[in-house]
């Protein structure tokens, strides 16, 4: 299974759960610049308390997911990851903060075609500052 297929699987789950998201990090950078290989996917999500249990259950079958870590990080607006059991690709979920900047960044995200499906992609003007913030 290719990274593209893992991304599709994750995006379909997020859509089914009605969780707002945007692709970020190195995979998003590939849309705007010189493509490079990466073994993980960064996705910023805006998840509600009422969606957490369904989120965990949805990913639990095909992915390794630490439910305790998810619960801890969601309450602190941190990040957690899942790993597809059959294919070693890590997906980092970064919890969207409730700052004006982060809320506006979600409003600026773009819908792009990736093969035969669409994803929400961080805007280039938000991608660079996010990469700098996460590197600290």
Label the predicted regions.
Residues 1-136:
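Compositionally biased terminal segments of proteins
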